[in-house]
From Swiss-Prot:
GO terms for molecular function: arginine-tRNA ligase activity; ATP binding. InterPro entries: Arg-tRNA-ligase (IPR001278), ArgRS_core (IPR035684), DALR_anticod-bd (IPR008909), Rossmann-like_a/b/a_fold (IPR014729), tRNAsynth_Ia_anticodon-bd (IPR009080). It catalyses: tRNA(Arg) + L-arginine + ATP = L-arginyl-tRNA(Arg) + AMP + diphosphate. GO terms for cellular component: cytoplasm. The lineage of its organism: Archaea, Thermoproteota, Thermoprotei, Thermoproteales, Thermoproteaceae. Belongs to the class-I aminoacyl-tRNA synthetase family. It is found in: Cytoplasm. Its main location: cytoplasm. It comes from Pyrobaculum arsenaticum (strain DSM 13514 / JCM 11321 / PZ6). Its EC number is 6.1.1.19. Keywords: Aminoacyl-tRNA synthetase, ATP-binding, Cytoplasm, Ligase, Nucleotide-binding, Protein biosynthesis. This is Arginine--tRNA ligase. Disulfide bonds: none annotated. It comes from the Archaea. The gene is argS. GO terms for biological process: arginyl-tRNA aminoacylation.
Length: 630
């Protein structure tokens, strides 16, 4: 139910009558932005005299409107306000009937969606950048589910490639020590340390070999400089992680780690049983830790999709390369044994820029290595085909803007293979990076802030905030406040804008934070806890201006949900909830609820209940935990 539906229809009917009186063949649309009233419409393009428009409006002044008031003409604008009493009745009726589903309308039902998010490499803990991905994807799924769409959430496990093999080789070199560490630390954290150390050892070995072959002194000096950088990385890792990293260096220092990784990856992709056993042991350890982190945020995954199973062992990625070579030999080139598809020429020739919503520049794409093994983009095409076959109307892939070209290549290759509908079905839900002031992250160098660290610090800082308010319950609720603050921080900004993560903003108790919203909810809850059951309240003819504003804001909730789900923008919900909370807190300071006279008291209790109902629905969509004390 949408409380604004009847008022909007009544205004539209009035516009129809005005247009008829003026002899116009069409009715102007209602403006999205307000002009001189809640509803406005422009008559500018009809080139009529403003006096005629004013006269036509005045003829309707006694039309007995139920839901709008103050119909007027200002220049060539026709405007109307809302009848606050009738709007209040519509709001209370909708809230009573819909309960926690208030905000849902049939227009929100868009079909079925496969949402893929997070999909982090299984070699280290989720870091702060993965946090934005995971929280965005989870809130998209929640928003779609709130609107009764069928949704399934997937995580793509990228278990192939040299980086996973580095983690596997390192882990098996210090397996006994690693298992001891895992008894007292998260497995993804332990494997992450091992991976960073193994990668550094591999890079040092590779660079040393290259330096030995270098003929040019300047090039040799450059390589030695790079070696020194990686030695510094190892030194820093040993200072922070001690014995475990030292053991990795001791046992791998004289081995050709890079060569071993290539060979292990070849065996794994070929389906060698022993390679599968050792690699999957490490991958599953990391996924166990990543699952724990996601669970902390209230995020659930419906299905874990392994790259090896869906793209490599199935032979799908290889078939894609063969089919492109067969269909489009004129767009295929060979460079040093690698297969390259001229996606740039293909797009130009078939004019696909707008059809596939492509970026302005498209480079050629390499499909295989020189040894014939397929690369990431080819496997991603195989995965996209598998996703499309699962029977969903849309496939939403939450992937950073850094992969804009890779995701464009996926759509182009699908189109080239004859899967035009699949290419159009896939949505690359792009998002920008999270910046931590003063820090540049690199997982390969073991330099990143894990999502667990962010959540730990959020809980710790929240505990100190909460102690000032309720010292006896600080420890119990600090985690929920921390989770709410982090989730809101990642959702309140447009996905296409970078986030600068600052604690003074994330935990702001006065506005625009998850903490502020939770604090507002506790205020509403505490009022209703002391009040008798919410009864069907009558709406007074006269009310405070803040009460009118609150009723209008609550009435707008269904349209906010509708716009958010159509645009796939949870930040619309975050922005709306912040505005609602600001209005409610201002009202809370001015208007007594429980001590008001009987008729007014019932109305205000119903108003507070409506605010609480909307906050609960919004909290579900954003994944913010509800609190009853703070």
């Amino acid at each position: 139910m949408d409380p604004l539906k009847l008022p909007k229809q009544e205004f539209a009917d009035a516009l129809g009558k005005i247009s008829s009186r003026l002899g116009l063949a069409e009715v102007p649309e209602i403006e999205k932005t307000r002009r001189y009233g809640y509803f406005s419409a422009r008559f500018h393009k009809y080139k009529i005299d403003p006096t005629r428009l004013r006269d036509a409006v005045e003829e309707l002044s006694n039309a007995g409107f139920q839901y709008i008031s103050g119909l007027s003409a200002e220049g060539l604008y026709v405007n109307a306000d809302l009848n606050a009493k009738r709007l209040g009745e519509l709001v209370f009726e909708a809230v009573a009937k819909m309960g926690k589903k208030y905000g849902f309308t049939e227009e929100c039902q868009l079909g079925s969606f496969l949402v893929e998010h997070t999909s982090a490499n299984p070699i280290h803990p989720l870091h702060i950048g993965h946090g934005r991905n995971a929280i965005l994807g989870d809130s998209l799924a929640r928003l779609l589910r709130f609107c009764d769409n069928r949704v399934e959430v997937h995580f793509y496990v990228d278990d192939c490639g040299v980086q996973v093999m580095y983690a596997t080789i390192g882990y098996n070199a210090v397996r006994d020590e690693a298992r001891e560490w895992i008894e007292r630390a998260k497995p993804d954290l332990v494997v992450g340390h091992i991976y960073s150390a193994t990668n550094a050892v591999a890079e040092i070995g590779r660079l040393k070999k290259e330096a030995e072959r270098a003929q040019d002194d300047e090039h040799k000096r450059s390589l030695i400089g790079e070696i020194d950088e990686w030695v510094a990385v190892l030194k820093r890792l040993m200072e922070s992680e001690g014995d475990l990293v030292a053991k990795v260096v001791e046992r791998l220092g004289q081995r050709d780690v890079a060569g071993e990784a290539v060979e292990l990856n070849r065996r794994y992709e070929a389906g060698d049983p022993e390679a599968k056993r050792v690699v999957r042991e490490v991958v599953d350890l990391v996924l166990r830790g990543q699952r724990e982190t996601l669970a902390r945020l209230g995020i659930e995954i419906d299905r874990w999709d392994y790259e090896s199973e869906l793209a490599v062992w199935s032979g799908e990625a290889s078939r894609i390369v063969e089919e492109l070579q067969r269909r489009w030999p004129q767009y295929v080139e060979y460079k040093g044994g690698a297969v390259v598809f001229r996606a740039d020429k293909f797009v130009d020739d078939f004019k696909l820029w707008d059809v596939l919503d492509l970026p302005k520049f498209i480079p050629p794409v390499t499909l295989t290595r020189s040894d014939g093994t397929t690369l990431y983009v080819t496997r991603d095409v195989a995965y996209a085909l598998w996703q499309a076959r699962q029977g969903f109307d849309k496939v939403v892939r939450v992937i950073s803007t850094e992969q804009t070209h890779e995701q464009a290549h996926v759509r182009i290759i699908l189109y080239a293979l004859g899967f035009e509908d699949v290419a159009k079905k896939i949505v690359h839900y792009a998002y920008e990076m999270v910046n931590l002031p003063g820090m540049k992250m690199s997982a390969r160098r073991g330099r990143y802030i894990s999502l667990d660290e962010i959540l730990d610090e959020a809980a710790e800082r929240s505990a100190s905030l909460v102690k000032e308010k309720s010292p006896e319950i600080a420890g119990v609720i600090a985690e929920k406040v921390g989770v709410g603050s982090v989730r809101y921080a990642f959702l309140s900004t447009s996905p296409r804008k970078p986030i600068e993560f600052r604690w003074e903003v994330v935990l702001n108790l006065r506005q625009n934070s998850g903490t502020f919203l939770q604090y507002t909810y506790v205020r509403a809850y505490s009022i209703l806890e002391k009040a008798p059951d919410v009864e069907r309240a009558s709406v007074p003819e006269q009310m405070l201006e803040e009460e009118k504003e609150l009723l209008v804001k609550i009435a707008e909730w269904p349209s906010v949900v509708r716009e958010a789900v159509r645009a796939l923008r949870p930040d619309y919900v975050a922005e709306y909830l912040d505005g609602l909370a600001l209005l409610f807190n201002s009202y809370y300071e001015k208007a007594p609820v429980l001590k008001a006279v009987e008729g007014v008291r019932k109305f205000r209790i119903a108003l507070v209940n409506a605010v609480k109902t909307v906050l609960e629905a919004g909290f579900y969509i954003l994944g913010i935990p509800t609190l009853t004390k703070m």
